[in-house]
Amino acid sequence: MTEPWIAFPPEVHSAMLNYGAGVGPMLISATQNGELSAQYAEAASEVEELLGVVASEGWQGQAAEAFVAAYMPFLAWLIQASADCVEMAAQQHVVIEAYTAAVELMPTQVELAANQIKLAVLVATNFFGINTIPIAINEAEYVEMWVRAATTMATYSTVSRSALSAMPHTSPPPLILKSDELLPDTGEDSDEDGHNHGGHSHGGHARMIDNFFAEILRGVSAGRIVWDPVNGTLNGLDYDDYVYPGHAIWWLARGLEFFQDGEQFGELLFTNPTGAFQFLLYVVVVDLPTHIAQIATWLGQYPQLLSAALTGVIAHLGAITGLAGLSGLSAIPSAAIPAVVPELTPVAAAPPMLAVAGVGPAVAAPGMLPASAPAPAAAAGATAAGPTPPATGFGGFPPYLVGGGGPGIGFGSGQSAHAKAAASDSAAAESAAQASARAQARAARRGRSAAKARGHRDEFVTMDMGFDAAAPAPEHQPGARASDCGAGPIGFAGTVRKEAVVKAAGLTTLAGDDFGGGPTMPMMPGTWTHDQGVFDEHR
């Protein structure tokens, strides 16, 4: 009897009883049940009086009899509900009395604390065993309080459980119908226990786990949810009586129903396998579609819930199918992308240096004759390159943007301070010198291209490609002359070098005298003429 409670010390039981909710909530509930019983009794008396008036004065014949017969079940339910409320209030008072008695019998916290303090003092002053007998008496008192607390809790638990089981459960009110002919006839037989054997049956006998869950539901809901696994009812109604999924109790009824279905299927599987699969077929074909139809009807009444559910389902399906579709991308042949390969000129045919449109490269010729400047038409034609450019022509970008040979005169210029003699001004001599210089320059470029090709070149076009007018003959082309206003032989196109001015180039050395013969300082273009008029007359 005291098995669950004897394992705990009396301090635990005393704290649970003295520091709990007390009898206040139970007294309020008992009072409300008494008031509810009085209201049910008053309603029953009103209905009974109304039925008496209808039967005696208001109506006559079969209509009056049908009216009275239709309301008689409801009148009986009102009377029974009033009696149930009275019985429930009485059982609650029994629990209140049991609680009060348990509090009186339970050792208080003060008594338990005093016993422990006394024991500590006796043990501390137990010199030569003089307190042995008082210590034994004190421990015996504590054991007695331990047993008394366990017995008190066991008695209180037994009385409370018996009162709880004796409390009646009020069934829902019956329907007010004219006769039993309006009730649906399912054509299914039931035994005296009320279990349906022709179709989907619930209940039969309660298992230990069913009773455990029933107690949990009752405790969590404070008695508002009563599950009867024996009869297969929830709050007095069969599972199938809950047809509206908008109520939370519908989902609870479905969960309990399928839980008991699983238990019944497991039992039949070991005792009657054929009946087990017939039962499973009925659940899948009849019971489950019925509940699905109820959910569909409920969602149809609330389109926003249906749209939200469909949106979530479609989103998840779209994600799954999208990931599955990625696996098929490897089988799709990719579109052929044409590789852009620049058309390169053979290394042997390319010049060793790039030219800039409008700037003519200087070529060292015999006698230090300056190279002739390109014609304006040639400078304009360098920007219109054809689809298949020839091997010679002007480049498309300045050569100083890339590394390599440069425009022809590097940092280590080999020109000395002693200038050569000026070229003849006659047109015939210049034409002959230019032709010879071009021939030698082409030979030198071919040799240098074969020896070392930089590899940073562009396509070249011919000067006369894409133009209506033919390029001028070499003998009529003006020669390129270095100007004092330019950067040496690669000066501005169309300028003429001033013959009277000595060109500044590189470092100069002094005569080998007492002051030395080494380089002193670079020659700066201090002898250039900065007068704009002088510059214009030589253009």
Curated annotation (Swiss-Prot):
Biological process terms in GO annotation: response to host immune response
Alphabetical list of SUPFAM superfamilies matching this protein: PE/PPE dimer-like
Localization in the cell: Secreted
Regions of compositional bias (Low complexity) in chain numbering: 433-442
Biased composition annotated in UniProt, kind: Basic residues: 443-455
Acidic residues: bias regions: 182-192
GO cellular component: extracellular region
A Pfam family reported for this protein in Swiss-Prot or TrEMBL: PPE
Region of interest called Disordered, as start-end residue ranges on this chain: 179-203, 433-459
Highest taxon in the source lineage: Bacteria
Keywords: Secreted
InterPro entries according to UniProt: PPE-PPW_C (IPR043641), PPE_dom (IPR000030), PPE_sf (IPR038332)
Similarity comment text for this entry: Belongs to the mycobacterial PPE family.
The name this protein goes by in its record: Uncharacterized PPE family protein PPE20
Gene designation per UniProt: PPE20
